[in-house]
Amino acid sequence: MSEAGRAAWLAWKLKTFGDEKSIWHDGLGVEQVTRLRGAARADALTMLRQGLALGDVHAARALAAMDDPDAAAAVRVALDRSEGNERVWLAVTLHQQRPEPALAGHLIAVLQTINPMQPWGFGRVDAAIGLRHFAGRDDEAALLAAVADAHYLVRYHACESLISRWKITPTSIAAHPDIFAEIRDDVGDHALARERLRARARRPLSA
């Protein structure tokens, strides 16, 4: 693609979704394009396909949210090539459009991949959050294991996702002080926290 085409895509992306820092901090506002109709939608699809051709995973996620059949195959290629939080939210977006439990495997892979330079990051927290949108046994097991993760933010969001999946009330882990006390610190009894979560949801310990 020409430099002019690349520049046009980047300018449109900035105008539509904000800069990269805003997208990282606030998330990709796919509603900016999913709400469009008629010619405006067609124009957005054209620009997003252009972004996808440039390898922009944000374009892939927006196209997935718009449920664009013409880009479906290319979006899947983008998913397989993506990493970290971008892989997480592209998989979640696809699942939200058409439930596909196997997509949880992408989130599990991110959750279980530790970057020595940033052990809690590289999408691991996002994966713990994103798994609340699934309901399979393998992804439940991955979240339960993450309750004992070495890093607090992963533990916290794994608990929050299990609470959401199991429909436990109150809906915040901080509102369950006997569990929160065990995951708040690295020296807490994380196995006990896991058992108490299961008990709160009346889930058998062998499940």
What is the meaning of each model-derived region?
Residues 1-70, 77-88, 95-124, 174-180, ...:
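Extended repeat-based scaffolds of very large eukaryotic assembly and lipid-transport proteins
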Residues 56-77, 87-88, 131-151, 155-157:
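Internal alpha-helical scaffold/solenoid segments in large eukaryotic proteins
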Residues 126-204:
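Extended alpha-helical scaffolding segments
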